[in-house]
From Swiss-Prot:
Any one GO MF annotation of this record: NADH:ubiquinone reductase (non-electrogenic) activity
Protein name: NADH-quinone oxidoreductase subunit K
Assembly, per entry: NDH-1 is composed of 14 different subunits. Subunits NuoA, H, J, K, L, M, N constitute the membrane sector of the complex.
Family designation: Belongs to the complex I subunit 4L family.
Cell compartment(s), UniProt: Cell inner membrane
Length: 135
């Protein structure tokens, strides 16, 4: 009976703040690790990658290079989601990355199938000739 009373006394002496600090400490450590790269730098990198991909889509006329530029643009958007999610220690950014990665894989598969069909019909990958009709 004395042992049970001493255990109850020790539990009563532990302040609630120590329990909260034990739960908050891993979150603070995660913020320190993820905070090595500022959010602005990550978003600037994502913006630069998106601009490179956009220039590639607008300038290049080869269908394969246009698909690669589109992939760069999708990866830039995924990077922006991951950076934003890591800023607030929220897994939503990583979940969106998985969705974008899945979408990019489907886009690549369909795009390459269209590319092969286009190449077998035309013999080249110039998209400017796609509006010319056979006749």
């Amino acid at each position: 009976m004395v042992l049970a009373a001493s255990v109850v006394q020790e539990v009563a002496n532990v302040p609630f703040a120590h329990e909260v600090a034990g739960l908050v400490q891993p979150v603070a450590e995660a913020q320190n690790v993820l905070g090595l790269i500022p959010m602005s730098h990550g978003l600037i990198l994502a913006g630069i990658l998106f601009a490179i991909g956009l220039c590639g889509v607008m300038v290049r006329r080869n269908f394969l290079f246009m698909l690669m530029s589109l992939e760069i643009m999708m990866n830039a958007a995924a990077l922006a989601f991951v950076v934003a999610g890591s800023r607030w220690v929220d897994p939503d950014g990583q979940i969106m990355f998985i969705f974008i990665l899945t979408l990019a894989a489907a886009e690549a598969a369909i795009g390459l199938a269209i590319l092969l069909r286009f190449y077998h019909q035309r013999g080249h990958l110039d998209v400017d000739s796609a509006n010319e009709m056979k006749g």
